[in-house]
Amino acid sequence: MLNYKTATNEEINYNGIVVKEISPTMKLNLRGKKREFFTNIGKNLNMLLPTEANTSTISDKLTAIWLSPDEWMIVTNDEVKKDTNEYQLNEILFNDISKSSLGAIIDVTDQFVQLEIKGKNIYEIFSCLLYTSPSPRDGW
């Protein structure tokens, strides 16, 4: 279920770098190994899941991204309407896959934020090191 609240409704411009939040897109995490899982997914999504590492398949409405040999991310190619809180596809897959113990369907839409970043120094920003681990001198 989508409980999306945007962090910002505006573009932020700082020293020629523009950051804007992109409207959310539905994201479902799929896990399964059984042949019936693949048959059911293919029937419901009208597409085949990629089976090679670091590949994806695309249809008119959906993109399937390979995450591991038994895990995929399904992303809608359309932005989510903010006035709805249900996904028909999520419910269909949950009923056909999870309830029948063929695999797992997890809605991870609220877990990720997508940002559009543009400006003349973008490559310099992304080439900078970012330390995320605490330093021993910080008392850890």
List each language-model region with its residue ranges.
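A glycine-rich, hydrophobic loop/mini-helix early in the fold
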Residues: 42-75, 82-97
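Short glycine-/aliphatic-rich beta-strand segments at the starts of folded cytosolic domains
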Residues: 19-34, 108-126
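Single conserved hydrophobic/aromatic residue that forms the stacking wall/gate
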Residues: 131-140
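Conserved short beta-strand edge segments in small beta-sheet-based binding/regulatory domains
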Residues: 100-109
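A short secondary-structure junction signal
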Residues: 92, 125-128
